Amino acid sequence: MSIVEEPYLQLIRDILEKGHEKSDRTGTGTKSLFGYQMRFNLAEGFPLLTTKKVPFGLIKSELLWFLRGDTNIRFLLEHNNHIWDEWAFKNWVESDEYHGPDMTNFGLRAQEDDNFNKVYQDEKKKFCQKIVEDQEFANKFGNLGDVYGAQWRHWQTRNGETIDQIKDVIETIKNNPDSRRMIVTAWNPEDVPLSALPPCHTLFQFYVNDGKLSCQLYQRSADVFLGVPFNIASYALLTHMIARETGLEVGEFVHTLGDAHIYLNHLDQVNEQLQRKPNDAPTLWLNPEKKNIMDFEMEDIKVKNYHSHSAIKAPVAV
């Protein structure tokens, strides 16, 4: 069994066994636990799940999008990444400029009505095409507000200046590795009402010991089946990339969850996943010629020996 994957599978088991049923913003309903922690030793393998196929290309393009300080889905769409489509699409169909079919509560309706789902998928496809082809439209409706990229790279101060938290934390790791202030936060209370989706992975901290870089993430809200596998791999990748720039080896990724939940319409999927036997964890390859985290492109990041079971589809709660 892959040691790297086991903490995640145990999280699923614990929620199924001990979770509390709760209502939620999306109207779907969840089983939930509060205050849960997983630890992944990054030296033992890269924590990309093997009990279902996780598309690593989406993970690395999203992380590069964050690191660019970008908040517009156009970059993602140009890399065939549709993770954030629904939130930008929601802004579009709720605007005065939208005159197409009624898209009220499109997330739930698409799950319950096959005919509506076809209309919804068609409208969303047209929206995404227009984002890519029309810069003015993309500027207006492709922007998600002050989400991760903005907060990481362009945190707005009260005097009108900006803070590049990623640059600052890398400099601190290099020059003062024993600091307890190596923190990046995406949670800005002033900006929360203005974001398409307030940051779920809210704050992360680095720790250096014995030449190894570890990272701990606090995630306020954790969609365990769909979101958490991406979050684990994304922050593991970020830790590897920053370790490369700072001349360190990788240590642990510690994942602390606030509200860790499985949506009620994902229960069949998680039970199917638990029936599968994990394979050995893959390894991460970073282009050895790239030293600066901002210089990485898609082709500079790969996973090797990734052998997974098939994907398991599930609806996104919006």
Curated annotation (Swiss-Prot):
Location, primary (coarse class): cytoplasm
Gene3D superfamilies assigned: Thymidylate synthase/dCMP hydroxymethylase domain
Binding site for dUMP: 25, 180-181, 220-223, 231, 261-263
GO CC annotations, alphabetized: cytosol
Catalytic site positions: 200
Domain of life: Bacteria
Pfam family, any one: Thymidylat_synt
Alphabetized GO MF terms: thymidylate synthase activity
UniProt entry keywords in alphabetical sequence: Cytoplasm, Methyltransferase, Nucleotide biosynthesis, Transferase
Keyword Glycoprotein: no
Signal peptide positions on this chain: none
CDD domains tied to this protein: TS_Pyrimidine_HMase
SUPFAM superfamilies associated with the record: Thymidylate synthase/dCMP hydroxymethylase (SSF55831)
GO biological process, one term: dTMP biosynthetic process
Binding site for (6R)-5,10-methylene-5,6,7,8-tetrahydrofolate: 223, 317
EC number, as in UniProt: 2.1.1.45
Pathway: Pyrimidine metabolism; dTTP biosynthesis
Record field: catalytic activity: dUMP + (6R)-5,10-methylene-5,6,7,8-tetrahydrofolate = 7,8-dihydrofolate + dTMP
PANTHER family according to UniProt: THYMIDYLATE SYNTHASE, THYMIDYLATE SYNTHASE 1
Role played: Catalyzes the reductive methylation of 2'-deoxyuridine-5'-monophosphate (dUMP) to 2'-deoxythymidine-5'-monophosphate (dTMP) while utilizing 5,10-methylenetetrahydrofolate (mTHF) as the methyl donor and reductant in the reaction, yielding dihydrofolate (DHF) as a by-product. This enzymatic reaction provides an intracellular de novo source of dTMP, an essential precursor for DNA biosynthesis.
The family this protein is said to belong to: Belongs to the thymidylate synthase family. Bacterial-type ThyA subfamily.
SUBUNIT field: Homodimer.
Protein name: Thymidylate synthase
Organism of this sequence: Ligilactobacillus salivarius (strain UCC118)
Gene (UniProt): thyA
